[in-house]
């Protein structure tokens, strides 16, 4: 039986360059020279990102950008998943999530950042006429995108004007011109909440946009953290030491001193430009272009030979965004269910196939009648899972919930369509949901319905349910240890 408490996590990198060296030591980094931003980088991304074990790829010598200005894609796949999270190689994705839960989620030790005077990000400081973001290698990721999205693996640093806490959140950024990008912030997200406070006062919002940096910051910024908790504190706790931050010379906002590229300026409600469309995580161009506030960039900071972190959604299946969110969101949901007092939830998996949002599977050790429905309804509503969910499936603990074949088999053989399904209505959805009606979009009604499926053996006669003819998960693991070499 896997025991995640016996693992001693160690994150061996502190910035993107050290991350690349670690990934290179695993033999999982390739370099492409001369690919065009207009089409070829996007095509290469479509090839390498969907496979579960595709390599990380660095693009250099991109026409239109100085040599040495690089772009990295596909950081979270293959052996790089365990390496990025500080865990040993050889763990399954469910075991990675269990280890993440045990060491980073169950009882987190947050460590606030420290402010330092200088850092590598200030190797180049550009202001005034020198501000020109067009020199950075920024591709058209999808053929019908409305522009060049420099911010896909980025995060926006903002401060609550009242409570003064710092948030780092992921919001896509499209280039408008040499000195500005438009940012799409979705209602309910923490950056949006900060933005609205400034705008209601008639003020611009100070913002630092980190375009290239340590993948851990992007991962933490891209998952649903508690309101008021700074993502820097989370990463500091994971590393067991504080993050070193510098303050921007324009806004005073803190950002990691070893960031690759940072744009600093003010988000202006009175300067809106059309943003989008963009091929989003649902696999669709689900929303048209819309007028969004522009970040007026007053300073660019970047290291020598800077590296953009690119994490574009592929959609229609699994991509690196779905892979990292599956591990982290599953652990977060498990912790939230435990905090709600729900007993014996043995496994949680937020499936990649729905961008780790739409399909959630849970295994339980049944304790009482109604246990499965309790778990399913709560899982459909928790903070880690409520956004964009469409389906929750609850199964018995003999099923590997991260295995779609096992999950579908359990559902088809153990649930009854007439009696095992509950529909929840007016739940929180997302503007990226392609199933929102035109009428909903007109009034910004971003809600959906979702299905809770009880695919457990019926509690009242579970002992009479036919026995399965397959070995237990423990026996399967033993068999793989003994005979896995036959598959190599």
PLM region descriptions:
Residues 1-294, 298-488:
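Extended, highly charged
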């Amino acid at each position: 039986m896997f025991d995640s408490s016996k693992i001693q996590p160690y994150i061996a990198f502190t910035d993107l360059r050290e991350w690349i060296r670690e990934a290179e030591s695993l033999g999982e980094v390739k370099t492409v020279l001369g690919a065009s931003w207009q089409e070829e980088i996007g095509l290469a991304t479509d090839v390498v990102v969907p496979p579960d074990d595709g390599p990380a790829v660095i693009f250099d010598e991109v026409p239109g950008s100085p040599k040495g200005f690089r772009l990295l894609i596909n950081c979270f796949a293959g052996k790089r998943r365990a390496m990025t999270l500080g865990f040993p190689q050889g763990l399954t994705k469910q075991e990675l999530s269990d280890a993440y839960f045990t060491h980073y989620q169950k009882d987190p030790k947050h460590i606030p950042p420290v402010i330092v005077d200088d850092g590598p990000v200030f190797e180049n400081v550009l202001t005034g006429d020198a501000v020109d973001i067009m020199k950075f290698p920024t591709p058209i990721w999808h053929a019908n995108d409305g522009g060049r999205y420099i911010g896909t693996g980025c995060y926006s640093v903002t401060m609550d004007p009242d409570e003064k806490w710092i948030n780092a959140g992921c919001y896509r950024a499209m280039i408008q011109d040499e000195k500005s990008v438009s940012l799409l912030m979705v209602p309910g997200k923490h950056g949006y909440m900060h933005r609205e406070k400034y705008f209601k006062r008639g003020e611009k919002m100070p913002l630092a946009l980190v375009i290239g940096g340590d993948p851990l910051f992007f991962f933490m910024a891209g998952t649903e953290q508690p309101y008021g908790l700074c993502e820097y504190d989370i990463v500091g706790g994971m590393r067991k030491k504080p993050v070193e931050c510098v303050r921007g010379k324009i806004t005073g906002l803190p950002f990691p001193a070893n960031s690759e590229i940072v744009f600093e300026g003010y988000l202006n409600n009175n300067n809106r430009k059309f943003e989008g469309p963009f091929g989003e995580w649902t696999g669709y161009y689900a929303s048209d272009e819309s007028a969004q506030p522009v970040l007026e960039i007053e300073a660019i900071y970047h290291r020598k030979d800077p590296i953009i972190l690119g994490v574009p959604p592929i959609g229609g299946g699994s991509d690196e965004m779905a892979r990292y969110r599956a591990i982290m969101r599953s652990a977060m949901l498990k912790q939230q269910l435990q905090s709600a007092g729900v007993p014996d939830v043995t496994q949680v998996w937020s499936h990649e196939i729905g961008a780790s949002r739409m399909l959630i599977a849970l295994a339980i050790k049944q304790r009482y009648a109604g246990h499965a429905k309790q778990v399913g309804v709560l899982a459909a509503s928790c903070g880690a899972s409520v956004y964009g969910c469409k389906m929750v499936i609850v199964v018995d603990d003999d099923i590997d919930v991260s295995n779609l074949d096992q999950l579908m088999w359990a559902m088809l053989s153990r649930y009854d369509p007439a009696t095992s399904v509950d529909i929840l209505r007016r739940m929180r959805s997302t503007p990226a949901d392609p199933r929102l009606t035109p009428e909903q979009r007109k009034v910004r009604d971003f809600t959906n319905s979702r299905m809770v499926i009880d695919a457990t053996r019926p509690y009242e006669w579970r002992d009479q349910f036919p026995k399965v003819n397959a070995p237990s998960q423990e026996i399967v693991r033993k068999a793989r240890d003994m005979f896995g070499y036959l598959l190599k």
